[in-house]
Amino acid sequence: MNYIFFDLDGTLHQQDMLEAYLKFMIRIRPVWTVLSFPILLGCFLFYLLFSKKTWGLNPLFFMIHFGLFRKKQIRLIQAFKTEFLDEVQPVNSMLKQMKQHIQAGDYVVIISGSLQSLIETVYPQLTKHKKIKVIGSQTQPFLGSTILTSRCSGRNKLRLLDEQFSPEKIKFEVGYTDSLADLPVLKRCKWAYLVNENGKITLVN
């Protein structure tokens, strides 16, 4: 059995799910956004400076979710799912490619910087498929809010992958992504491809 790596955002669909979710949460709570605007602005600037780090996003993530009870957060995530699916632009050629790999008996591993809980909600058909494993960023409750405990990006993708399949360090037959930020994972791929916004692939040497 071959393992196949797929990124999600920019590869299987064009949008950045985590970015769309953060914008949704800011927009859906206008009163809270206005009252906390100076703090949110500071958190956003902090994120721009340290965008690749888990702790770089956490102040903004904490403020956006502050004061939300779990039931309310679940309702908002369901509302986000409806809005996101109405607007998302799938990369059909890559979805077809993934389907072909599965039909050939391959095991697909989707590793995404988006929240794993969001992916599971928006795309339950992926997370429930016996030939697909989804790995994403992790969160946990913290002081009346929610924070990221692990950001699934860059080298962290490789760490989370190895944790999921420990003690085996799997190698991929083929890998697909839209970004060379996934180079640590691509180095585990026998064949690695970059995907453009039209779904066309280019071999990475």
Language-model features and meaning:
Residues 1-50:
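Active-site neighborhood of HAD-like aspartate-dependent phosphohydrolases
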Residues 14-15, 54, 154:
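Generic structural signal for well-ordered secondary structure
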Residues 15-18, 57-58, 70:
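Alpha-helix initiation and N-capping motif
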Residues 25, 62, 122-123:
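Broad structural signal for hydrophobic residues in well-ordered alpha-helices, predominantly aliphatic
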Residues 48, 56-67:
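Helix-loop "lid/cap" segments that line or gate small-molecule binding pockets
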Residues 50-51, 93:
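Short leucine-rich amphipathic alpha-helices used at interfaces
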Residues 55-61, 77-82:
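Glycine-/proline-rich flexible loop or hinge segments
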Residues 71, 75-78, 82-205:
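C-terminal cap/substrate-recognition subdomain and adjoining C-terminal extension
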